[in-house]
Amino acid sequence: MSDQQTCVIDNGSGVVKAGFAGEDAPRAVFPSIVGRPKNVSALIGVDSASEYLGDEAQQKRGVLKIFYPIEHGIVKDWDDMEKIWNHTFYVELRVQPDEHPILLTEAPLNPKTNREKMTQIMFETFNVPALYVVIQAVLSLYSAGSTTGIVCDAGDGVTHTVPIYEGFSIPHAVSRIQLAGRDLTTFMAKLLTERGYNFTSSAELEIVRDIKEKLCFVALEYESALKQSHDSSQFEKNYELPDGKVITIGSERFRCPEYLFKPLEMNGRELDSIQDLTYKSIQECDVDVRRDLYQNIIISGGTTMNEGIGERLLKEIENRAPKSINVKVIASADRIFAVWRGGSTRTSLSTFASMWITKEDYDENGASIVHRKCI
């Protein structure tokens, strides 16, 4: 299979990242959405279709009902998921899937039936020659050049902390909360409403997401930042809306991501904070590996892209960790693509050749082969 270029596909709840093994960045990055017209007359015209995928669905979302086949990291709608994969191969990457080995990523604690369904669709619908399925966090760690550490991965639909030892995740110590990018966008809209700006439709929430991504930051000392924002306008920034109107954003810039660190205080949700999630995962591991985990905390995913998040997480974990341990948080500049890049690197290695589930393996054993080959 060495002459066939591997396709690496990282399916996130919010965004698909797809490309070819050995390359530094994905060729295609597009929303993991399927859009269908709210009513048939809304899209009369030459280009009207019964459904739209990815960027096209995003552009037309004002007149579409938007569906996310992946919710909180787990595939919920297989028909739509198949459409997303079809779009990935034929439109975005422009490849014939039966000519390329495929690496797919999965969320930690992905149900066994889901792993089998992914495997079945790849071999039976797309007729791929070979497949490998790997946990996203393992690839994040891999792209950071390590095989032991703990990954705090916050995407669009779910946040996970995954301890990994010598390249294998430690399933009983994996933690997750359904608090991630989409929740922060909704929370930001709520904060902006308090300021007198109303954003409610799905198209308007896209504007809020852009505000969140461009202007938010994590305060190292939240209370003192809050006091400063009351006493001065130093945190205020202007944002121009698509219609040309300019709005001013102030303390919302750091109050929004504070939700990750104080879910109960900020928005009344009784969830673990990301620092508690990370700490609990480490404490669930064998005492002998904890030091290695504390010294190699990797943050990845789009929701970790706000400035200051690494420093704040470090401070919070240092407050909880044994004083004798030198805690280290690693936040690479392009961590939004860490999972994809880890997959690109890993499948490029000659040692990976024996890892694949081949078509022969599948024909002989069925979809359950994924549990034996992809541990």
UniProtKB/Swiss-Prot annotation:
Its main location: cytoplasm. It comes from the Eukaryota. It is an enzyme of class 3 (hydrolase). It holds the Pfam family Actin. The keyword Aminoacyl-tRNA synthetase does not apply. InterPro entries: Actin (IPR004000), Actin/actin-like_CS (IPR020902), Actin_CS (IPR004001), ATPase_NBD (IPR043129). Gene3D superfamilies: 3.30.420.40, Actin, Chain A, domain 4. It catalyses: ATP + H2O = ADP + phosphate + H(+). Keywords: ATP-binding, Cytoplasm, Cytoskeleton, Hydrolase, Nucleotide-binding. Signal peptide: none annotated. Its EC number is 3.6.4.-. GO terms for cellular component: cytoplasm; cytoskeleton. One of its GO terms (molecular function) is hydrolase activity. PROSITE patterns: ACTINS_1, ACTINS_2, ACTINS_ACT_LIKE. It is found in: Cytoplasm, Cytoskeleton. SUPFAM superfamilies: Actin-like ATPase domain. Actins are highly conserved proteins that are involved in various types of cell motility and are ubiquitously expressed in all eukaryotic cells. Belongs to the actin family. This is Actin, cytoplasmic. It comes from Oxytricha trifallax.
